[in-house]
């Protein structure tokens, strides 16, 4: 049976400042940690990325032409405050006013994120969100943006608090490149959630007319053998690291006894302790019912089995299928069952995981209000032929996930929109320019845009709400 989505459903496309804008040192923009980190550790940089800084009118015109009625944009913090605080960069402010005006001109609603992996270097080198001073700096930055940009109707504080901590302190593929420090992972998650809570409370106290939420990456975790208690435990612990800890902070305003038992076990095995203060929980508690929506980024699920050995994580950054490894002492090891398929970057394709995660939020956090799928898509080594890309695999991937959303809505979940990652091809943090996600192919040398087959398909779905 053909499935449908509601008439008022947002069919969006997602971007991020550092991955799309380029212009990393233009018009007074301050440095971010990624600038030097990429030069020192990778074979690519974020110049020119998709040159969105100059070509956003082209991308928004394409969005309008192809039925995309929402766009995720992030503000580059260091474009507004080059050092993270203090002096405002007027040219950065002007750029975002112009960008948001173009969005509204093209009838593409901007969903604006304040922080998408790009803390200004001056703050990052001072401990980033492990340093509690950053909480205050972030809230000041948020307060400025809320007041300066009343044309924005939908705000999110952070993009993917979980993967920021993981990338910086567990996998070590984000600056500062620290590996296997679980205490830093949890502390980063916690301090960022306190920052989120303070910003949300401020937004509501000021009486702004828009909506505000947060974007969490929520990869669903399953036991490899559901009958094996050790595998079940491994999946539960992995879920605490990546999902439950930050969801509890968002919607409970505290960490459940079950969550803290898992955290304490993980730290007892791996070392370290947390600084959780009474005033933190006062802030979390005050904001737990103020979130207007939850953004869920979903790409994949993982299966876990019990594991007693030493921690080892190998990141597959070049699309060499089967080269990744993930095992954490005292938690478990990721082992994919035979029946699931995976991408060249070892990301497991499992649409059912999105349904299960949405229903988990609905059941465990009934104060969630509504959900947007703020990122979902398929990274490909696209083959550019005849001025297009015949990306049937991407179409199939998105179709399956949209069908899952139709099912979730039918089963009572309040899902209001979907943002494909990404609107156009963008630079990828730890994969460079080879891994493409866009509806529009970008020739990174000429910066020309070309609609892929998926863009034509997405337009039809957006216009009809029929998933076909």
UniProtKB/Swiss-Prot annotation:
Any single GO CC term annotated in Swiss-Prot or TrEMBL for this entry: cytosol
Per UniProt, what is one GO molecular function of this protein?
beta-glucosidase activity
Q: Where does this protein act, in terms of pathway?
A: Carbohydrate metabolism; lactose degradation; D-galactose 6-phosphate and beta-D-glucose from lactose 6-phosphate: step 1/1
Gene that encodes the chain: lacG
Traced from the root, the source organism's taxonomic lineage reads: Bacteria, Bacillati, Bacillota, Bacilli, Lactobacillales
Per its record, how is this protein called by name? Answer: 6-phospho-beta-galactosidase
Query: What Enzyme Commission number(s) appear in the record?
Result: 3.2.1.85
The active site is formed by: 160 (proton donor), 375 (nucleophile)
Instruction: Give the superkingdom in one word.
Output: Bacteria
